[in-house]
Amino acid sequence: HIIRNKIVYLLHLSFILILSGALTTHIWGIQGNIHLRQGETPVTTFNKNDGQKADLPFSVSLKQFQLTYYQGTFAPMDFISILNVYDGPQMHEGSVSMNHIYTYRNYRFYQSTYDADKKGSTLSIAYDPYGIALTYTGYAFLLLSFILFFFDKHSYFRKLLNHPALKKITVCILLSTSVITMFGASVPPSLPKETANEFGKLYVYYNDRICPLQTLAKEFTTKLYGKSNYKGLTPEQVLTGWLFFYEQWKQEPMILIKDKEVQKLLGAKGKYVRLADFAGSTGYKQEQISPSDMNAKTTRAIEEANEKFSLASMLCTGNLLKIYPYFDKNNAQPIWYSLTDDLPVSMPHEQWAFIRYSMNLIAEKVAHQAYNEVKILLDKTKKYQQKEARGFLPSDTRFGAEMLYNRMNFTRPLAMFSLTIGILSFFLYCWKMAKQRNSSKKQNSILLAMLGIVFIYLMILIGLRGFISGHLPMSNGYETMQLMSVCAILLTFLLYRKFEAAISFGYILCGLTLLVSMFGESNPSVTQLMPVLSSPLLSIHVVTIMLSYSLLAFVMLNGI
């Protein structure tokens, strides 16, 4: 009881410290911003958030501002301000970036924004030495009290953990899922699989990064059709089909439109429409709808349909395929062009002709079914890419890892498998509880072994995605749901000895989270992170939140 009371006192003390820190920050904390320019005299004042001026006990100037990019692209990776701080006779140098705070005499400098000419920087300033110290101390005590609570033998948590009611479940969950698969009567013309795969091995500038064309093909197919393959064709076959057999593919009902109003507007009989359905005798059909007839839902659905129409149109014109790098000595890195882009006048004529006509030559060979010659031309194109963008391309290992990831990433069947096994094992567990029979150790071992295989598969996917992107894969809903699936499996292995139903719950939670991630997979992209999102602390925060959600889900299922 004495130990438990100490834990309770520590818990209440943590709340007092946290609230005291917040009050201290509100009353005595100072926040504002300061604008600095390279080459200007040091600044001794800054603007507070209330509009008033405040003095600094030192002066600060901007020595240099740096804007760094992801390799081979123009996507910003970080904003860095290098400062000179003058305090009496002393001069200190410090740097501020999106994920690095510079602190001097309890003044904290944060990177906020920068000037268009990249010669100036705006920094946020915070001065709150006492509020921060009180708040952080309070959170440390709060965490310590929670940990001590679980180790207290007389706590209600330990009593509930061994309570017989924990092992009885009175309500069964009924979850029915259905998978509807559509196959057309005929397959549209396409390249042989081997030839299409050679296209997938080209480099392409897409989503502000350089990746295999296979990635673009998969995301193009998924964006239009909702799945990564169409009528048994690979994503590369779909993409090259649209590129070289446009007249036939525009008649294919493969563009997914979910909204009934948009389906009616396009004259479609189902949820899949043709590209040809977007245009009528009087022009583009979606421009004919009156704004007064559009609500927020319809407007959003029309925008999504327009996006798919534009994506298909960009591919068919070649504008989507930025596969031709050109390195100008006046630029720090190569610029990637499509065959329809305006090319710089400084480009040599031979290079200009290659970019303008190489794809036309490939199309001619495709028309004559000279696929061996197509492969030779694709090899020449890739050699041109490697020569012109040398030093700016992803490594062969990373390039191969991305192609492996594209071939391995099948979330839908894994989600359905996990849900099916989870529901069946849950019903079996309930039946054995009703019959007062013990579960078979062999059965549990098989279930755990299969769950272990799912865990390894997910970890490989997450590892590949992290290696490809160059950051921890926790930056969007798709990635965080994958992480939550892993957390659910880990909790299953930790809890199943004390709580047998955790095996079924682990499968169900894994399946449900993967099912949710499928919504993100309908528009997935491995992109460069905005600088503020690449913080290790933010990644730790996401892991903690996902783990807590997994625990909460176990508690919810246990309550049912």
Give short role names for the model-derived ranges.
Residues 1-560:
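Solvent-exposed, non-transmembrane regions of integral membrane proteins
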